[in-house]
Amino acid sequence: MFALLMMLFASFVGLSGALLVWPGADRPQHVDAVLSLNGPDEHFREQRALALVRDGYARVLLFSEGHYPEVPCPKVPHVVVVCFVPKPARTVGEIEFAARYAARHRWHTIMVVPGHTQTARARLLLARCFQGRAVVVPAAAPPLLELPYQVAYEWGALVKALIVDPGC
């Protein structure tokens, strides 16, 4: 019994690492817009999204203000910045907003900047909600001391997205 529990624990740790701690990242590409998701590590996401639009990967930045509106809507020369409050104020609301906005503007590609541990859930929701091609470029990893909380939170959010509240 102990061996089985240890094997299950090791599998859980390995899966957590693969999905949440070291998520697969796409290479930045030229796209119709960059979507910056909101969350507790907002400054990492904002910095990454701003760097991508400043480097010319897109001329439009969709900036979610969600639960953390203390981060002001950024201003970027020669870039259209669309700040929005998603409804619902969760990742699914952000992805749904971006999908509707993209359809309205006939966009085919978006680059999404999720929180590092949020990458797997962002990919899941993009596959459900966005009809075009999505490039996922996660923000920098959170500080090591925040990682256990973020991994635990993300497991709950991922289960919710899979089972309880699938969205789109």
Regions found by a protein language model. Give the residues of each.
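A structural signal for short, hydrophobic/glycine-enriched beta-strand patches
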Residues: 20-152, 156
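Structural signal for membrane-spanning alpha-helices in multi-pass inner-membrane proteins
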Residues: 16-21, 161, 165
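Short hydrophobic helices that act as membrane-entry/anchoring signals
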Residues: 150-168
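Hydrophobic membrane-insertion alpha-helices, especially the h-region
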Residues: 1-17
